[in-house]
Amino acid sequence: MNDVTYYLISLASQSPAGSFGLNTNNLVTTLINIGVVLCLLIIFGKGFLRNFLDTRKNKIVNTMQISDELYSSAVEKLEKAQARLCKVENEAKQLRVTGYSEIEHEKLNLINSTYKTLERLEKKKKETCSFEQQQAFNDVRQWVLQQTLQRVLKTLNGSFNPELHLRTIRINISMLGTLK
């Protein structure tokens, strides 16, 4: 780099006539100016550029480290979540199986209870029917007996006269006397 600088300086210091004068060649002058500016930038800007690039490199490295840590943490959390999911799924299956067996058990209990209740109600129904039937028979007997007694009384009242009445009383008294 120093060689280029010396070459450019030597070109600028030489004039075509051998003395100090104006260079009318704009292209050469522009190239010399660009070279001088670049040399100055390289010499004086090297530290700034190095610091800028080092800072940028450190930021990138830190960002990558943080990303790796976050990735590791996310993978760890994912593995824990998957393990927890498997555990919960197994528990859900177990609860489902247990629930189905409990439902079947409760269903059987309900069927048995309903069957027993139906038997009890059927027995009560039969008892009630029997009681009602017996009550109806008793009511009919009582009515028939009452009707019969009323007829007998009517018949007796109509056919009894005082003489027949006395004779019946005597016969009954004599029968009672023979029983003793």
Swiss-Prot record:
It holds the Pfam family ATP-synt_B. It comes from the Eukaryota. InterPro entries: ATP_synth_b/b'su_bac/chlpt. This is ATP synthase subunit b, chloroplastic. CDD domains: ATP-synt_Fo_b. F-type ATPases have 2 components, F(1) - the catalytic core - and F(0) - the membrane proton channel. F(1) has five subunits: alpha(3), beta(3), gamma(1), delta(1), epsilon(1). F(0) has four main subunits: a(1), b(1), b'(1) and c(10-14). The alpha and beta chains form an alternating ring which encloses part of the gamma chain. F(1) is attached to F(0) by a central stalk formed by the gamma and epsilon chains, while a peripheral stalk is formed by the delta, b and b' chains. One of its GO terms (molecular function) is proton-transporting ATP synthase activity, rotational mechanism. The chain crosses the membrane at residues 28-48. HAMAP family: ATP_synth_b_bprime. In plastids the F-type ATPase is also known as CF(1)CF(0). The gene is atpF.
